[in-house]
Amino acid sequence: MPHSSSNSVSLLVALLTLLGAAAFPSLAAASPDSVRAVAGVRHVDVALMAPQAQKTKSKSATKKKASQATSAKKKAETSKKATPATKKPVRPRPEWPVKGPTPLPGSLLPHKRIVAYYGNPLSKRMGVLGEYPPDEMLRRLDREVAAWSKADTLTPVIPALHLIVTVAQGSAGRDGKWRTRMSDSLIERVYGWAQRRNALLFLDVQVGKSTLQAEIPPLAKFLARPNVHLGIDPEFSMKSGHAPGKRIGSYDARDVNWTVDYLAELVDKNKIPPKVLVIHRFTRPMLTNSKNIRLDPRVQIVIDMDGWGSARLKQDSYEAYVVSEPVQFTGFKLFYKNDIRKKGWRLMRPADVLALDPRPVYIQYQ
């Protein structure tokens, strides 16, 4: 971890104490490690995985990549840079549900709930999707779907696999974009797994120093399928010029609006039901000018609270970074390992998440 990390975290704790003490007690009282859980990088995403076509590389090259991955993981511990602390009045809580376009026929939300397994089969460290053999992974997903169906009998549950298809890297690569694209064959393989459960497939994009405009169009042939949807991760959109993992990245409303327009055109062109767009978020600067995001009935937007930590910290982060800046629908991420990494922490149960207001309609497990 860089030496500046502890200073950054201390500044962040002070900032949160000033800004959030009244509305979000656990954010204000959090220890540096707990603050990092929500304001820091998620650790496991920057995996420096070689593309599937490059499996023939020498063992020495593989070891070098592993060493780089360890270095990138350590860099990912750094918290976001604190801004000058200015005490602001507590804003009134926005009204939910958001007033938006009437759902079109075939829309999934808000009358269904999506329960997804996140990750990449080339790495056990990036999430549960790649941690287990396919059959076992799908059986575990079945159990979660059953648990959510039991917890909320009025909302049908749809299983999903959330595959990271563009992976941020800790090195520039040949084209200097600091990201690796997964092969079509890998995407087809995971799509096949989803088909075995009549599940959705989400394609998740970490652009590194590339752009959404460059990374999403190559996925068009998959997104043209009615059961394939999209996720975009601001954490690894490095407009600052830093390497992924050194700073938390960001998207602006303009980036989201471009993505919505692109997906809407695909819906019209292919005469398919509306798409779901998942946007990860666990700090305020990750998504700027959210009030300027345009809603379109052909694309349903989910802001997914993506921080790990204690249940109280996650609840307050949901309120601070998702509920307080309404876009359209909400999601909530649960980490099998990071959410229980400290004594006294426990994995939130479906009933715990359903107690949130508004109730998340997209649930992701990593």
Go through the PLM ranges and name each one.
Residues 13-23:
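Bacterial N-terminal signal peptides
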Residues 23-54:
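Signal peptide processing junction and immediate N-terminal pro/mature segment
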Residues 47, 51-89:
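Polycationic, low-complexity disordered segments in secreted or periplasmic proteins
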Residues 51, 247-363:
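Surface-exposed substrate-engagement region within the catalytic domains
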Residues 73-75, 80-135:
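N-terminal module-boundary/linker segments of secreted carbohydrate-active enzymes
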Residues 113-117, 159-163, 201-203, 226-234, ...:
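Hydrophobic faces of well-ordered beta-strands that scaffold small-molecule active sites
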Residues 147, 156-235:
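Substrate-binding cleft of extracellular glycoside hydrolase catalytic domains
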